[in-house]
Amino acid sequence: MAEVLVLVDHVDGAVRKTTSELLTIARRLGEPSAVFIGTGFDAAKEALAQYGAEKVYRIESADVTDYLVAPKAEALAQLVGSASPAAVLIPSSAEGKEIAARLAIKTESGLITDAVDVQPGEGGGVSTTQSVFAGSYTVKATVTKGTPIIAVKPNSAAPEAVQGAAADEVVEVTVSDGAKTAKITDRQPKAATGRPELTEAAIVVSGGRGTGGDFSKVEDFADSLGAAVGASRAAVDAGWYPHTNQVGQTGKQVSPQLYVAAGISGAIQHRAGMQTSKTIVAVNKDEEAPIFELVDFGVVGDLFTVLPQATEAVKAAKG
């Protein structure tokens, strides 16, 4: 059974949920092998084994860890050359997609980004599903050249724990001078909000122009659900919420199990960032709002009335 490489997404050895999802997907395609770049492997090993990693390639060279994405792509390209994997799975984050693109060029392979499903292809290979053209179409695709390089959106699979050996192998890589032109000079930890990361959250509650700048009801409802908080571009441009929380074509793309849009009209730019959500709920006073065209459930009403009622109902259900 051919190896399937999974690039580990972690912070100092704390493995993110996206990695357990990718390891679960990798088991559909072959034998999962994790690629761990950076420090903190001892803390990560158990989590990688828990979700089926049979092997872990460790890349700890400062030439890779002290620079931005280019050395990581070079290291992966060398590993692809030696391991000849059936596919490479990478988280579809901003950094992940850049690594994937560089890797595809270096290995002369086909690239698929923002996949929301990955399955074995008919007659071999890999088949993916993704949303394209600002969410206007859902398509299936396969890579026809080289090693399939696939960037997968968070929440594309439910993590399934299966014990793996996680036998580690230290990999020595050579990084070209051309890849070391952007050095990391400082790292600042992100301030904790008490809420899940927007792109990884299973539930996202977003507010738009309809909030009038008051996100308190959106935040209260999100907190009752253990959800992340998002915002439309209109709300961000008005200065009501940080750009780091913007969902849409020029913000972050999310694909949670549940997406709640409160006071958001549903312009195509916003839909491009959330249309692959598994279940979509909208709350809007305007019954003609475009957002109602793609929702699973819609509530025509004032979010300042609807959301507090929903928050109390959630709290009551939790006891």
Where do the protein language model's features map onto the residues?
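N-terminal glycine-rich FAD/FM-binding segment characteristic of electron-transfer flavoproteins
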Residues: 1-319
